[in-house]
């Protein structure tokens, strides 16, 4: 499939959490010092689902929200953005998750979460829309849904059903250490489902965390390889990404843009990649085409860093193509 704005037909189902990010109106201050906050919908799997539709693809979200104003607002945002919402459940007893995000002057973030428990943690296997999951050509997920039961059991069931139905499994661990009981538990659970994934994307920081090495090199990345993996990606921020397949590996350069907020950049990158490969997985075996797709994905990620919040900043295909052509 050419790298253009053409709509893909295969369904990408994204599983996990959706929440409200409260982002300070001023960068470079602590949460206590922030004069105010901008309310921004977020949650990595939901960001990916919207990134896909923004680029002309077809996506659905599976997860649980609070039966509260924020939860219904988030469901409305998914629908407004063309994401199929038949996989959403609402919990009457728990609130929608909130995250307060500290923005450093360089746009990097620190998080403080309010989920004790939040609705997303309470999704059960019985609440899953299995028909929707079976219809996925790509099933995408993170690791936050592995932290506690019953959501962990729902995650495992959904993954198993998608795999049995022939979906490509896409995994972005999206490490958020403050949510885990310990770093050791985070590493153990993130690795517990490692060998099921066909495509894995980690950031350079996550690579260091998972390998225990401070080197971002091929040897370190390949220590995460497993025999059934089709593509391993290590994102490097504005430097682009490294890619690894069974037959080849290399680097795709990034884009220099004025970074305001890095929230959602990785999700935008993943959404772009999945939109391009959902109908033609042979791209994963053709280095020239894969590099073209990854360059497009890097452009999408870069654009997402130029605005505050994730979902408002996710680009259209034409915006990404403008940056690719050097017009931005």
Swiss-Prot record:
Q: In which pathway does it act?
A: Glycan biosynthesis; starch biosynthesis
Please provide, in alphabetical order, the Gene Ontology terms of the cellular component aspect for this entry: cytosol
Its domain of life?
A: Eukaryota
UniProt keyword annotation of Nucleotide-binding present: yes
Q: Return any one Pfam family short name.
A: PfkB
Print the keywords alphabetically.
ATP-binding, Carbohydrate metabolism, Kinase, Nucleotide-binding, Transferase
Q: Which PANTHER family match?
A: FRUCTOKINASE-4-RELATED, HEXOKINASE FAMILY MEMBER
Q: Which family does it belong to?
A: Belongs to the carbohydrate kinase PfkB family.
Give the residue spans that cross the bilayer. Answer: none
The answer to whether keyword Membrane applies is no
What is the organism field in this record? Solanum lycopersicum
This molecule's function is given as:
May play an important role in maintaining the flux of carbon towards starch formation.
**For this protein, what is the EC number?**
2.7.1.4
Q: Which reaction does it catalyse?
A: D-fructose + ATP = D-fructose 6-phosphate + ADP + H(+)
Q: Name one GO molecular function term.
A: ATP binding
> What biological-process terms (Gene Ontology) are attached?
fructose metabolic process; starch biosynthetic process
Which protein is depicted?
A: Fructokinase-2
